[in-house]
Amino acid sequence: VFLRDGDIVSGSNWTIRSIHTPGHCSNHLCFELVEEACLFSGDHVMGWATSVVGPPDGSMKDYMVSLRKLLSFNHEQYWPTHGPAIPDPIEYVQSFISHREEREDQILEYLKHGPRKIADFVPEMYEKYDKRLWYPAAGSVHAHLLHMVETGRAEVTDDHREPKLTATYQLL
């Protein structure tokens, strides 16, 4: 079954609407159980942490747009793939948006000190976290930097100008 944004699947006493929420991955869908005003949020909104947004299939721009899109619904609860149920999803999603905006501000602050590689500042940004999380965190930082390159706030300084995980970035 192929579903697009807004497609409906229904039975005698239930209706499920698909909501395209790219970001974690380009083809991610959440599923709204209309009668219960709840959302099966999959990997887009997890019950214990923000999703890893890892390029090339993950996009921070898409992730942020999709989070804001979910705010336009009036869901009473989310059921994520990972973690517990989320009883106050609007406040929870807003906290994810704020968290990602704060991370982006952190990255901009690091880049104010000159060209840097992701590996130069991930240990500082995530020093309070288990080191095993640093590699996925680097993927999310990379997604932030790609978004900053796309929006003209940063650039790659390496010879090939390819915005990859090992590239050197600087502010524009």
Feature map (PLM): residue ranges:
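Metallo-beta-lactamase
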Residues: I8, T15-Q106
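C-terminal regulatory/interaction regions
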Residues: E109-L172
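Alpha-helix-centered segments that form part of catalytic cores
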Residues: V1-S12
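Conserved hydrophobic "DFG−1" position in protein kinase catalytic cores
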Residues: G11, F31-L33, V156, L171
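A short catalytic or substrate-binding loop motif that flags glycine-/basic-rich loops and adjacent residues
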Residues: L3, P22-C25, P163
